[in-house]
A protein has these predicted regions:
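Polar/acidic, low-complexity leader/linker segments enriched in S/T/G and N/D
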Residues: 1-46
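Structured catalytic/translocation cores of nucleotide/phosphate-coupled proteins
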Residues: 1-5, 65, 217
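Membrane-targeting and insertion segments and their boundary/processing signals
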Residues: 43-50, 132
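Structured, beta-strand-rich domain cores
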Residues: 62-138
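Mixed-charge, glycine-accented linear interaction segment located at domain edges/termini
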Residues: 139-142, 146-217
Length: 217
């Protein structure tokens, strides 16, 4: 038995930042076969909803709580976006460099990375990979303003909802988080080779069951 100790050296952890965003447009088979680097990504906000309790009463007492299904939505903010995003945002090319709106929106997945730090190694402690599946972007406002003496770049913003995908042995999910401080480096490198591509293969987003296979190999 040992007494609990708070704020030990090396255990004062924090999470910060967002970088290395990748967009994966879903194909007709439900796979995410090709990734595109998302430059200018500034914010990804994950906003779970649901999981609300509905109380049931019997015998003049609270009998139990029924929980509603939890869903994942969120917001993406960026200064720019890859060309592949157009079809996820309801646009279609009718000629080179010419786009029309109000078109069907494609489902997408994405990957982004956040930084893990502590009181010893600061931001070099580690990172988390966030994988999102079955996302669908909603129409969003774009505000264009004149250039003035306080110039600002336009920040684009999109809200998204998700449809979970199957995971063997668990309920369907729309997101996976991988912690680099807890996964073997060789297995993490193998997963990143799939997510980001390499000299021989295109970047793609593996489905959850394949992620498990890679990290459990």
């Amino acid at each position: 038995m040992s007494k609990l100790v708070w704020d030990k050296t090396g255990e004062r952890l924090y999470e910060t930042g967002v970088k290395q965003g990748v967009l994966y447009v879903q194909d007709a088979q439900g796979a995410y076969p090709k990734g595109a680097a998302w430059n200018g990504l500034t914010t990804v906000t994950e906003s779970p909803s649901g999981a609300e309790a509905t109380p049931l009463y019997a015998d003049d007492i609270k009998y139990l709580n029924l929980m509603s299904t939890e869903e994942l939505g969120g917001t993406i903010e960026a200064y720019t976006y890859p060309d592949e995003w157009a079809e996820c945002d309801g646009s279609a090319a009718i000629a080179t460099g010419v786009y029309i709106g109000q078109q069907p929106r494609k489902t997408f997945g994405m990957c982004y990375r956040t930084t893990l730090g502590n009181d010893v190694e600061n931001n070099a402690y580690g990172y988390k990979l966030h994988l999102i599946y079955g996302a669908l972007a909603a129409p969003s406002e774009k505000a264009y303003a004149t250039i003035n003496d306080s110039p600002e770049a336009i920040t684009f913003s999109w809200e998204f909802s998700t449809t979970p995908v199957n995971v063997e042995g668990f309920k369907p999910t729309a997101n996976i988080v991988i912690d680099s401080t807890k996964v073997e480096p060789e297995k993490l490198a193998a997963l990143e080779a799939v997510l980001y591509g390499d000299a021989e293969t295109e970047a793609r987003l593996p489905l959850p069951d394949e992620v498990v296979q890679i990290l459990a190999a």
